[in-house]
């Protein structure tokens, strides 16, 4: 199956060829945001023009590529809650994290993934994908190209790259009565069988090497084995011992404190919008908690938070 991205974009953007020659892989604004624990995360955001073309490219790729069902991030109709639900009834849990995930994905990994899916792409279209969907950190003429955190095309491309990996890991897990899901760089495994999650851990190591060499690796500082005897969390959602999903005590306290500050008029615009997102997240996971907030602070307060976020 052959795809022609160039012709479609040339029709949509009269100045497309000029923009391509201007090395769009360097058209990024770079800034840092602090991580939850230590250090900073580098965000590289493309210019609005490049961003628009990235979105168009993804729409074209969606018509010709396959994303595995194990992928739950950046997939239409799936979210963090769906990812957690996969594991809510299991006793044993394993969580793995991939090091600097987006920044480890290169054009070559994408092209290999497309070839595995029998997608034929010309050198011209490969160059187009390199320039518009990858970030040249150094801005040098032959600088290394990687996916950036901040580009709208990065999530979908990462799912294409990981598709064959997800397929192999899913098959292994099915044979061993293990549930598997991947939310971007967060890999979660769960089971009711004793002593099998270590096998999954080893399988991930060997499968990463087979598909990516040493390019994409496990973060050994973030390996978590857990069970119902301990607190279990999957992509920010707490799994309770009675097979329910919960926000967890710490997050509930945090949201409650923000609602109190909102009512006192002590939150900035940015904080209010952040709170709005948390309220929506909480309602999807534990609606009874939102009902308790409404009783404590008034329904009008919670409605005001939602209304504010909508620009009202």
UniProtKB/Swiss-Prot annotation:
This is Retron Ec83 reverse transcriptase. InterPro entries: DNA/RNA_pol_sf (IPR043502), GrpII_Intron_Splice-Mob/Def (IPR051083), Reverse_transcriptase_msDNA (IPR000123), RT_dom (IPR000477). Residues 14-239 form the Reverse transcriptase domain. Pfam families: RVT_1. Keywords: Antiviral defense, Magnesium, Metal-binding, Nucleotidyltransferase, RNA-binding, RNA-directed DNA polymerase, Transferase. Mg(2+) binds at residues 97, 185-186. It is an enzyme of class 2 (transferase). Belongs to the bacterial reverse transcriptase family. It catalyses: DNA(n) + a 2'-deoxyribonucleoside 5'-triphosphate = DNA(n+1) + diphosphate. CDD domains: RT_Bac_retron_II. The keyword Magnesium applies. PANTHER family: NUCLEAR INTRON MATURASE 1, MITOCHONDRIAL-RELATED, RNA-DIRECTED DNA POLYMERASE. NCBIfam families: retron_St85_RT (NF038233).
């Amino acid at each position: 199956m052959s795809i022609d991205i160039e012709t479609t974009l040339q029709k949509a953007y009269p100045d497309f060829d000029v923009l391509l020659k201007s090395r769009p892989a360097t058209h990024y604004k770079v800034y840092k945001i602090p991580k939850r624990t230590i250090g900073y995360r580098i965000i590289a955001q493309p210019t609005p023009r490049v961003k628009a073309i990235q979105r168009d490219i993804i729409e074209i790729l969606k018509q010709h590529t396959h994303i595995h069902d194990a992928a739950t991030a950046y997939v239409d109709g799936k979210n963090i809650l769906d990812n957690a639900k996969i594991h809510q009834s299991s006793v044993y849990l394993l969580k793995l994290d991939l090091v600097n995930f987006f920044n480890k994905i290169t054009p070559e990994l994408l092209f290999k993934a497309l070839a595995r899916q029998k997608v034929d792409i010309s050198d011209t279209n490969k160059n187009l994908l390199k320039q518009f969907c990858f970030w040249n950190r150094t801005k040098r003429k032959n600088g290394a190209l990687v996916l950036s955190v901040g580009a709208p095309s990065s999530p979908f491309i990462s799912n294409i790259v990981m598709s064959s990996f997800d397929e192999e890991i899913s098959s292994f897990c099915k044979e061993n009565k293990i549930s598997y899901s991947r939310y971007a760089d967060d890999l979660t495994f769960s089971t009711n069988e004793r002593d099998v999650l270590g096998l999954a851990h080893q399988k991930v190591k060997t499968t990463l090497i087979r598909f990516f060499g040493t390019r994409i690796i496990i973060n050994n500082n973030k390996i978590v084995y857990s069970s119902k005897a301990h607190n279990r969390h999957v992509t920010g959602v707490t799994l309770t011992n009675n097979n329910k999903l919960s926000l967890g005590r710490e997050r509930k306290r945090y949201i409650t404190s923000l609602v109190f500050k909102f009512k006192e008029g002590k939150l900035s615009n940015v904080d209010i919008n952040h709170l709005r997102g948390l309220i929506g997240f909480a309602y999807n996971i534990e609606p009874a908690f939102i009902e308790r907030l409404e009783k404590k602070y008034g329904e009008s307060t919670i409605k005001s938070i939602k209304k504010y976020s909508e620009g009202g």
